[in-house]
Amino acid sequence: MGVGIQVRDLNAYYGKAHVLKHVDMKMAPNHVTALIGPSGCGKSTFVRCLNRMHETIPEAYAEGEVLVGDKDIYARGTAAVDVRRRVGMVFQKPNPFPTMSIYDNVASGLKLNGIRKKAVLDEAVQRSLEASALWNEVKDHLHKKSGASLSGGQQQRLCIARALAVQPDVLLMDEPASALDPISTSKIEELMFTLKENYTVVVVTHNMQQAARVAEYTGFFLMGSVIEFDTTQKIFTTPSDKRTEDYITGRFG
């Protein structure tokens, strides 16, 4: 089952540039939370801080608390690799390993964690592909086709399966449908509804209609700060801050 995420006074930097400023947010378990805002507002940096991907960039670092369940992922002695096992990530552009089969793409994280038993891998691959609504489309050529041979929408669902294979608590999705056609986008959105039954889902999106369709909660970012965080219905119908209203109604962004 998914776990809640509580962010307290999170600040992120690229060298001397202060790009996330005193962010507080509480994301409910087994719900979809959408993050919206104009380009460069900090929402993608924020989501990367939730599994410590931000620190993989030279001179980038973060300060503050991020509790996944009851564990602060920035606590001294916490290994980033353990954090990323609990908090999976799916990126804007599908990135399957091009030389690997569909099967090996999904099993790659498990193998990195030392799992070698075929029966265990087989079960995990099928479970993950079923959870990402891809199993029926690829089950007959798991070992014959590479991940790169799939369509764009299938590749993105393969990347979701790869993230799910290690059984995370949280799934982060950074504009997962922005590079896809409308039909593939619809499948990704449908998938979010089923994924939240077992995972906490956080999605970055530029698509306001998508946020309204898929998320129970929405946070609006602007210039590195969270301007407003509330239920999606309230954000889109009666926002408390005029800047939120201006963004949602297209006055800027």
From Swiss-Prot:
Catalysis: reaction(s): phosphate(out) + ATP + H2O = ADP + 2 phosphate(in) + H(+)
Q: Which keywords fit this entry according to its UniProt record?
A: ATP-binding, Cell inner membrane, Cell membrane, Membrane, Nucleotide-binding, Phosphate transport, Translocase, Transport
Q: Name one GO cellular component term.
A: plasma membrane
* Organism for this UniProt entry: Koribacter versatilis (strain Ellin345)
Instruction: Please give the InterPro entries that the UniProt record associates with this protein.
Output: AAA+_ATPase (IPR003593), ABC_transporter-like_ATP-bd (IPR003439), ABC_transporter-like_CS (IPR017871), P-loop_NTPase (IPR027417), PstB-like (IPR005670)
| Oligomeric and partner information | The complex is composed of two ATP-binding proteins (PstB), two transmembrane proteins (PstC and PstA) and a solute-binding protein (PstS).
Give the NCBIfam families listed for this entry: 3a0107s01c2
Tell me the Gene Ontology biological-process terms attached to this UniProt entry.
Answer: phosphate ion transmembrane transport
Subcellular location, record wording: Cell inner membrane
- The protein's Enzyme Commission number: 7.3.2.1
Family that this chain belongs to: Belongs to the ABC transporter superfamily. Phosphate importer (TC 3.A.1.7) family.
The entry's protein name is: Phosphate import ATP-binding protein PstB
Q: What are the GO MF terms of this UniProt record?
A: ATP binding; ATP hydrolysis activity; ATPase-coupled phosphate ion transmembrane transporter activity
Ligand binding (ATP): 37-44
Its predominant location is membrane
A Pfam family annotated for this UniProt entry:
ABC_tran
Q: How does it sit in the membrane?
A: Peripheral membrane protein
Query: What does the UniProt record say this protein does?
Result: Part of the ABC transporter complex PstSACB involved in phosphate import. Responsible for energy coupling to the transport system.
Give residue ranges for domain ABC transporter.
5-248
